[in-house]
């Protein structure tokens, strides 16, 4: 079945009928009826009359305001008679007291807030003099005044800068040097060669000027005269050989510069040998048989002797002991009877 096809009971009992209650008189019924008394006037919760913008309403509003002012004044008068006290015995301050003293104290307290340490805070609203005093009061532990770099420099403190005169003359590189009077006394540059170099060139170009060839090359036939007291060096512990202090007509070649050694006269051969020249000694008297013993030829190597072992005397021409002869160098026997030979003859004899 559909909803509209539901059966409806037509016959109902009288007990089931609900009688609606009597309606209270609505505002619509009383709308056009005049108000009987002023007690029906509507008012605000504080007792004031509602003003709907009508003239009559404005007049009634003034009356209601007067009534409310009277009501509040009566309440305050009643409150004055009753003194309220806090549990600690002090009088409470609700902020609505009209006494001049209390109001002045309250204003002072509000206008002068204090920090916990008792100082007055500075919110930047104080006068300039007050802020300057506070800045002057700050002092570092060492007694110096702190500098926060927030103070504006006064115009009086700054000195006016002196204006330098502008140079209007034409300037160029070196103008300051040329304009100075001391520059005139300086010597003028000359591009000529110095006289020393000219003299040196003249000496070299002269025909009489010649270079000594013996400066760079060692002389071969010059005689080197040893000093009277030659200085010799010997290693420690070796015996000093007995050498006559005054040699008789020694003939030796001068050594080279890098072979120079004090107390010795020697020369170097092209083969690289160094020959020491010993002073000439007269030969000993001939033996009884009239025959001299055999003499070792020149440049013949002899067994090397220790410097401490002195040679034993033999019936042959006396020879001086070896004076620190370098190793690998031949011993040279003195020529018989003081015979002199040249360097070329010496080379020829060595080749033969």
UniProtKB/Swiss-Prot annotation:
InterPro entries: PNRC-like_rgn (IPR028322). It is found in: Cytoplasm. Disulfide bonds: none annotated. One of its GO terms (molecular function) is RNA binding. Residues 71-80, 289-309 have a biased composition (Low complexity). One of its GO terms (biological process) is nuclear-transcribed mRNA catabolic process, nonsense-mediated decay. Keywords: Cytoplasm, mRNA processing, Nonsense-mediated mRNA decay, RNA-binding. One of its GO terms (cellular component) is cytoplasm. Its main location: cytoplasm. Residues 1-258, 277-352 are annotated as: Disordered. Residues 93-104, 205-225 have a biased composition (Polar residues). The keyword Cytoplasm applies. Belongs to the EDC family. mRNA-binding protein which stimulates mRNA decapping. This is Enhancer of mRNA-decapping protein 1.
């Amino acid at each position: 079945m559909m909803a509209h096809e539901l059966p409806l009971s037509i016959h109902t009992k009288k007990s089931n009928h609900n009688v609606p209650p009597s309606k209270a008189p609505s505002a619509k019924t009383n709308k056009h009826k005049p108000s009987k008394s002023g007690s029906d006037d509507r008012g605000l919760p504080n007792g004031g009359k509602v003003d709907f913008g009508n003239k009559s309403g404005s007049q009634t509003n003034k009356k209601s305001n007067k009534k409310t002012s009277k009501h509040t004044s009566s309440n305050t008068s009643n409150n004055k008679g009753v003194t309220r006290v806090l549990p600690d015995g002090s009088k409470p301050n609700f902020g609505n007291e009209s006494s001049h003293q209390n109001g002045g104290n309250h204003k002072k307290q509000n206008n002068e807030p204090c920090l916990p340490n008792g100082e007055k805070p500075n919110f930047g609203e104080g006068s300039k003099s007050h802020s300057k005093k506070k800045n002057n009061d700050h002092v570092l532990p060492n007694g110096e005044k702190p500098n926060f770099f927030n103070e504006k420099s006064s115009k009086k403190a700054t000195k006016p800068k002196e204006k330098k005169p502008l140079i209007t003359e034409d300037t160029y590189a070196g103008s300051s040097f040329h304009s100075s009077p001391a520059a005139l006394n300086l010597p003028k540059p000359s591009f000529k060669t110095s006289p020393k170099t000219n003299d040196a060139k003249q000496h070299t170009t002269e025909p009489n000027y010649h270079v000594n060839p013996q400066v760079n090359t060692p002389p071969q036939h010059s005689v080197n005269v040893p000093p009277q007291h030659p200085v010799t060096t010997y290693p420690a512990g070796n015996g000093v050989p007995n050498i006559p202090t005054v040699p008789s007509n020694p003939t030796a070649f001068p050594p080279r510069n890098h072979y120079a050694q004090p107390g010795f006269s020697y020369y170097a051969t092209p083969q690289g040998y160094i020959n020491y020249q010993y002073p000439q000694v007269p030969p000993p008297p001939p033996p009884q048989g009239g025959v001299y013993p055999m003499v070792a030829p020149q440049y013949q190597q002899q067994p090397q002797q220790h410097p401490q072992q002195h040679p034993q005397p033999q019936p042959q021409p006396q020879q001086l002991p070896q004076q620190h002869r370098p190793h690998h160098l031949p011993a040279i026997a003195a020529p018989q009877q003081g015979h002199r030979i040249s360097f070329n003859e010496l080379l020829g004899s060595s080749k033969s």
